[in-house]
Amino acid sequence: MAISLTEEDFVVKVFDYKNDKEWSFRGDRPAIIDFYANWCGPCKMLSPIFEKLSKKYENSIDFYKVDTDKEQDISSAIGVQSLPTILFIPVDGKPKVSVGFLQEDAFENIIKDFFGF
């Protein structure tokens, strides 16, 4: 199940954007973050897919959600401009960004291709 992140959680679990200039992931396994808003239609369509995949990969990938209305500083620091924005984060290396709704098969293909699962 996806975990909602506050600014405090994000800084501890993902990236300390306030103090680090270069990307430095703080997690110990891959992560996927859904940047969404409750009023966003495509975000609502993505939500059940995101939850389903979070259960399927719960033993290997951390799934997080960030409400862009509540956590505007995080969204701004990451450069979120459109919703939904999905951040695929490997343990080492730079994250991959996907903007817009993803069908379940396309979402899972990115997981398999990017993370090698």
Curated annotation (Swiss-Prot):
Superkingdom to which the source organism belongs: Bacteria
Xref: SUPFAM superfamilies: Thioredoxin-like
One GO location term (cellular component): cytosol
Family under the similarity heading: Belongs to the thioredoxin family.
Name of a matching Pfam family: Thioredoxin
InterPro entries registered for this protein in UniProt: Thioredoxin (IPR005746), Thioredoxin-like_sf (IPR036249), Thioredoxin_CS (IPR017937), Thioredoxin_domain (IPR013766)
Keyword field contains Cell membrane: no
Protein name: Thioredoxin
Molecular-function GO terms, alphabetical: protein-disulfide reductase activity
Disulfide bonds: C40-C43
Transmembrane portions of the chain: none
NCBIfam families, alphabetized: thioredoxin
Thioredoxin domain segment(s): 2-116
Keyword annotations: Disulfide bond, Electron transport, Redox-active center, Transport
KW Nucleus (keyword) present: no
